[in-house]
Amino acid sequence: MNTNKQKYEYFPGTIVLPSDTYDTKNHQLIGRRVAGKQFLEGITSNLKDEEIINIIVYSEKEVHELKNILEKAGINLNRINFNIGLENINLNKIENIHIAGPDLDQWSIIRSGFRRNLFSITGVIHTLSSTAVIKSIKDYLTGGLESWDSLVCTSTSGKKVVEKIIDFHHQELESKYETKLSKKKYPKITTIPLAVNDITYQRNLTREEKRSISRIKLEIPKDSLVILSLGRLSFNSKYHPLPLYRSIAKLAAKRPNLNVILLECGSFYNDNIKTNYDNLIKSIKPLKVIRLGGIKPATEKEKIDALNASDIFLSPSDNIQETFGISVIEAMAASLPCIVSDWNGYKDHVKNNENGFRISTTQLNNLENKID
């Protein structure tokens, strides 16, 4: 009898991860997919020695994609059970199903015919501005969810939005049926911020050494002032670049002996958006812009070099879906001082005049004063 045989137990959570939630290579590079990939790598690299985790995907292709990502991250694939759908999942042996979105109620139907407390269902918010997301939260009131299910909000502002959606529709139901309704059966709404890995690596190097190496790679003069804009390049779903461009041009004009460079690292959704950005840059003098990415998204290595090469991170976001802002956390992880708009999820990360600066969206044309 082999007494040394390893005994394994399952990680309590079964994770649902279709490729749309983490694949930044074959899908548009946006924050929720970056967060999904970080979550995937984080949870699979921190299993206990005796744990195995169940991951649910929707196709063989997604299994292959997941394995490639995890192998590159150095994850032991023997610790992961890849399941296409629920066919091979024993519902009596799981404690939780976690999805990378807020549509919890569509998963409650699989508890039909079982004890309602057989397992919990959890999810996480990303954008909250779409009609589909608002409807999925509205369904919490009339579907099969219970108080032991939970939606994780990544910021205080995100939690407030979810609570307002629930309260509005709760009052609507009370008015319709002319009765007082209990909230005891609603899922728990909690706040847990997103996290990132140590994405700049090379812990044996100082911040200055990393900056020097990356600037050589990117052909940026070592005495430059490099201001980083990281993330989606979109004037409607992130921020309009005009205030940023004008402010950096004003700083460059004010400090002619300082080589001020805006380093854009991200992706455009289409050629039309790219053309508009390029034309705007040409119209503003003096403005120097180096761009990593574009129609083809910046690679992970390019992002790391951008973070390492920069002096300041700046994000004047003013869109209606900035529930968190993972690029701010990435910048902080790279030891960059942050200047951001006083906006939604950013308020949780950046404490004004403590670990960065927050600027009102009505004063973004004066960003150069904070940079200076």
Model-inferred region functions:
Residues 71-74, 264-266, 274-308, 312:
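Nucleotide-activated donor-binding/catalytic signature segment of Leloir-type glycosyltransferases, i.e.
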Residues 60-144:
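Extended catalytic core of nucleotide-activated donor transferases of GT-like folds
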Residues 146-213:
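Donor nucleotide-sugar binding/catalytic pocket of nucleotide-sugar-dependent glycosyltransferases
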Residues 91-92, 298-310, 333, 351, ...:
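Short acidic alpha-helix that forms the nucleotide-activated donor recognition element
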Residues 305-321, 336:
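Acidic donor-binding loop of glycosyltransferase active sites
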Residues 221-238, 245, 262-264:
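Conserved donor-binding/catalytic core segment of Leloir-type glycosyltransferases
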Residues 337-340, 350, 357:
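Short hydrophobic beta-strand element within catalytic cores of glycosyltransferases
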Residues 183, 205-226, 253-257:
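Nucleotide-sugar donor-binding and catalytic loop/hinge architecture
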